[in-house]
From Swiss-Prot:
Part of the 30S ribosomal subunit. The gene is rps7. SUPFAM superfamilies: Ribosomal protein S7 (SSF47973). The keyword S-adenosyl-L-methionine does not apply. One of its GO terms (biological process) is translation. It comes from the Archaea. This is Small ribosomal subunit protein uS7. PROSITE patterns: RIBOSOMAL_S7. GO terms for cellular component: small ribosomal subunit. Belongs to the universal ribosomal protein uS7 family. GO terms for molecular function: rRNA binding; structural constituent of ribosome. InterPro entries: Ribosomal_uS7, Ribosomal_uS7_arc, Ribosomal_uS7_CS, Ribosomal_uS7_dom, Ribosomal_uS7_dom_sf, Ribosomal_uS7_euk/arc. One of the primary rRNA binding proteins, it binds directly to 16S rRNA where it nucleates assembly of the head domain of the 30S subunit. Is located at the subunit interface close to the decoding center. Keywords: Ribonucleoprotein, Ribosomal protein, RNA-binding, rRNA-binding. It comes from Methanococcus maripaludis (strain C5 / ATCC BAA-1333).
Length: 188
């Protein structure tokens, strides 16, 4: 028997194009993406957690959804169904493409030298790239759903689709990535 995500989508055919993110994006076949915190004991164990569960965990960061994992998993499942209907592609592959396109490659850090503080451009680790991408996708979806007729699932689907196409005009996550990289480039 083949295990599919939510019993619908096959994650065996999903490919990660970015070599730096390959070991941090986990698309291992799982029926329901809920590990109950098993991968939080060690610092880099979150790389073993399925990306759909990590997205649901980031959606729970909002004060209204705190602790409502079943609710956020239902939102993510509905968003993946919307993505499949619109793009006619595997929604897990679209999510992987969105993560690759919305994670910044470089950002700035504050360095103090002799009483003078200035910004210095630094490369971003793959783990932080993914964390930032998840945070910006979840934030973009919840912000666009606020005081809007669209549901959070529809807004999340829009955000993931636009981020997978690297659409800077419509995707909050890609816009934030470009902004961070622009600031880092000026701080070189």
């Amino acid at each position: 028997m083949e295990i599919k995500l939510f019993g619908k989508w096959d994650s065996e055919t999903v490919t990660v194009k970015d070599p730096s993110l390959k070991s941090y994006i986990s698309v291992a076949p799982v029926l329901v993406p809920h590990t109950a915190g098993r991968n939080t004991k060690k610092s880099f164990d979150k790389a073993k957690m399925n990306i759909v569960e990590r997205l649901a965990n980031k959606l729970m960061a909002n004060q209204n959804n705190t602790g409502k994992k079943h609710e956020t998993l239902a939102i993510v499942e509905e968003a993946l169904a919307i993505i499949e209907n619109r793009t006619k592609e595997n929604p897990v592959q679209v999510l992987v493409d969105a993560l690759e396109n919305s994670g910044p490659r470089e950002e700035t850090t504050r360095i103090s030298y002799g009483g003078i503080a200035f910004l210095q451009s630094v490369d971003v680790s793959p783990s932080r790239r993914l964390d930032t991408a998840f945070r910006n996708i979840a934030l973009g979806a919840s912000d666009s759903a606020h005081k809007n007729k669209k549901t959070v699932a529809q807004c999340l689907a829009d955000e993931i689709i636009f981020a997978s196409k690297a659409d800077m005009q419509k995707s909050f996550a890609v816009r934030k990535k470009e902004e961070k990289e622009r600031v880092a480039q000026s701080a070189r």
